[in-house]
């Protein structure tokens, strides 16, 4: 909506009447990671933390523990948005270069997380658009990891 309105496209405040429709889907849980999965695979996965730098560094804590999952790289979800183009996604070549500079490799499984998997769900899409194929989202994210007694943390 931000981009749409700022680019001069029409907006309306009229109410619309929903039209019934059928939506068929296949639930694919192979793209999800759990806390147990991450603990078991810390040595052979890559982690992308999509939270703010203050959350990643442990300066802001919204859980019992502050910091990030060991080995996680920071790539805030907004880093993929072009502020000069109404928050449209940056060109994939720029995103690929930024992720490569952080050490993320397309051949490895990358698990994305934030605090509640809202921000990192965009990061999941961004990685997919940038050509990553082995991506998992962590729905529990920091709201789970940061409150579990047996999870390691880095700051």
Could you tell me what each predicted segment is?
Residues 1-46, 50-155:
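Rhodanese-like catalytic fold shared by cysteine-dependent sulfurtransferases
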